[in-house]
Structure formats: structure tokens, C-alpha cells
Amino acid sequence: MNIPQLTALCLRYHGVLLDASEEVVHVAVVDAPSHELLDALHFATTKRIEITCWTRQQMEGHASRTQQTLPVAVQEKHQPKAELLTRTLQSALEQRASDIHIEPADNAYRIRLRIDGVLHPLPDVSPDAGVALTARLKVLGNLDIAEHRLPQDGQFTVELAGNAVSFRIATLPCRGGEKVVLRLLQQVGQALDVNTLGMQPLQLADFAHALQQPQGLVLVTGPTGSGKTVTLYSALQKLNTADINICSVEDPVEIPIARLNQTQIHPRAGLTFQGVLRALLRQDPDVIMIGEIRDGETAESAIKAAQTGHLVLSTLHTNSTCETLVRLQQMGVARWMLSSALTLVIAQRLVRKLCPHCRRQQGEPIHIPDNVWPSPLPHWQAPGCVHCYHGFYGRTALFEVLPITPVIRQLISANTDVESLETHARQAGMRTLFENGCLAVEQGLTTFEELIRVLGMPHGE
């Protein structure tokens, strides 16, 4: 009997298949196993049966977090195709997923959720169900359902648990079919408050000071999925008062906010970043938000807006604050324009948070070079418990904040290299992403291994 069949058998008798190796079948039940379950297992397999007794709370928690379902054949027999999409989206929402991956594999479609930055699998579905699911998503996203050879992207909103939830959809032709990735754009009840982002007090003070300026360019940088959007929208929410006119140009509008004039670009209709920016400048804005600076033309438009009496906020894909300055110059932005307009750069990453209920220090402290961090770091481990199941729950942000001081402006104008810029910034009090990560490890917020997974060791150490 294969694993999907064993999974279905266990579920039939209110158990959960935890593992099935060549010699052992490991099953979890509430309180004690029923005779029916044991008889069925012994009839189905000659392997040794190991039973783990869970409380009802553990079983309910496991079910809600992993969304155990029937295997493909049984699932599709008892569950209409239309319900598969709802269950998948609902699972993503309940488990705090940021992305849903639906991808063709051998003899099945694989579904995975990205939770706290790591992909977790859901049960596979059959090729027919996968194709039907992909087609339904393309209809919702207003994509060409007959086009299978070219990538497409779109957006849709559905109601889940009584709330409107928006997703961004992107398709990609692959061997065996189309791969679909959904990005959850709006999380229900998501707080947008700069005070809860996780910045250190000095960083928060620098951020607040930049937002109080009547003009200038504030950039938030980092890779996809590093929390830039929440930081940007939190800043907009702080500025969102009755006496301020805020306009944004986005692709797409990720979080609708009341009293903001949010415009989504539509390149196929001729509505581009540059076109919207030109129109926004005729709308008497006080604050302009540009979803992302993707090219030199957009960068120059943003800087010119910042030089003409507007506070401009945007994002960029770079690894650190100082690299942002070099990246903008590579886009063709003149050094004098950059030094005169830029007021603050924030680089950020997200790391998984240790579960406070089961974390503990084990083994010897971790020693790293003194030039990276001056003291040993605690070695944290979290085996998992009823609250988290795998040792981590949620994520926390690490920040690197660079105020553009007169000295930094002079260095930018002088075409100073990244290393020298970072040296001067650190001498002025800037703490790097890795240094803030080490501080988070000291505080028990995350592990050193998680820090290395996200950032790697600096300077090749």
C-alpha cells in the first residue's frame, strides 16, 4: 500500500500518518488508537506500527496548519473541482502564506505554500485537476485561457471567510504544463504602523525624520518578499492625514488604503509608470509613492519630482543601502541629482522568528570573527511544539537605515565606492543588516543558522 492510500486509511479512522519508512508506519491519534485502525493497518501492511498519542488540541492544530486532505484519487472523488481552488486559497490564508505555487510534475500537479519564507507542500492533485485549477485561475485573473505558450500575469479578488482577499497571478510555460504562482496581496487585519515594523529606536527616529521633510526621495530596498511593501504602506499610513494629498503609481495596487489616490499601471493600454508620473505631477500632490523603480527613466522622474517640492517614496532591488547609491548611478542617474534629492535609504530582510514556547539554548556559543560581531552568539534550537509545530512562527524584519547626511552627499558626488561609503556610514553610527541580525540572535528572536540562510556571512568570512 502506497503513502496516499495509507494517508486515506488513517484519516478514515481519525488518525494522521506521520511517516512511512521501509520498516515502520508512524501514526498519530487522539488519546489511544481504535481497534479498527490497528486492524486496518495490520491488514494493509506488514510493517511495524508505531503510535503517537496526541491531545485533541494537538490534532486540531495539526489539521489547521497542515490542512491534511484526502489523497488525490479520494479527494477528487468526494470533492468537486470548484472546491479545490477555494480550499487551496483558504489554506494559504489560514497558514499565513505569502505565495502559492501550482506546478506540473510527473503524473500530478504539485501545490506548495510559502510560509515564513519557506515552501511547504500540500497534497498533490491529478493532472486533470491541476489543468482545471490553472484554467479557473486564468479566468479569475482575466488572462487568455487559450494561451499556453507565453507567460501572463494579472490580478483578482475573491471572498474568503467573509473578507475580500486579493491575489496577483503569474503563469509560466514549463515542461508538462503551465506553472502558476499566486502572491497574496492583502492580508486580513495586517497592521500598517511604522512603530511596529521592528526598527531599532535610532532607525525609527531617522525614518520618522525623513517622512517629516517637505521634499526628498526615500527608498526601501531588498529582494522580493523582504517586506518592502509593508514598510512603504506603513509610511503612507503615517502620512495619511486630511491636509496631505498622497498619490501612488503601482503595479499592482497591493493594499488599498482609504483617502489615497492609488493608480495601477496598464502597459498594454499605454498606462506606464512614466505616463502616470507625469499625470500625477499635475494633480497637486504632496507625497508620491512609486511602487518600484525599474529603469533609469523612472529613477530620473522620481528624483526630479523629489527636487521640485514633493516627498517621493519608492522601492528598489539591491542588497544593501550603500549598493543602492551605486545601482542608481548604473541606471544613468547623475551623481549630483542623486546627492541633492536622496534623503534616506532603508535595506531590509525577513527572518523566521523562534517559537518562544519551545526555544532553548543548546551546546556551545557560536564564535564568529570579531570584525563581524565582537561576542559569541547563543546557539538556539526549537524542536517544535503544539504552538508552532516546527520551531518557528512568523517572521521579524531586520533593517539597515542610511540617512543621507552632508558627508554622505559629498561622498556620492565624489563617486566613492561602496566599501568606502559603508565604512563612513558605520563610523557615523549605521548598523548593518548582519549586525542587526546578530542582535536578533542575542535577543532570542531567531537563530544564527536562519541569519546565514537569509543573509550569508559578510565579506566572505
Model-identified regions with their sequence ranges:
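Short, flexible helix-loop junctions that flank or precede catalytic/ligand sites
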Residues: 12, 78-91, 95-461
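Core recognition of P-loop NTPase motor domains used across DNA-transaction enzymes
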Residues: 11, 15-18, 36, 40, ...
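Short, charge-rich amphipathic segments
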Residues: 14-23, 64-73, 142, 167, ...
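Short glycine/Trp-rich loop-beta-loop segment that forms part of the substrate-binding cleft
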Residues: 26-63, 198-209
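Polyanionic, low-complexity intrinsically disordered segments
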Residues: 1-43, 152-161, 166-170
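Charged, low-hydrophobicity low-complexity segments
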Residues: 43, 50-90, 95, 99
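Short, basic, glycine/proline-bearing loop/turn elements
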Residues: 23-25, 69-75, 192-193, 261-263
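Short alpha-helical interface patches
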Residues: 12-14, 21, 43-46, 51-68, ...
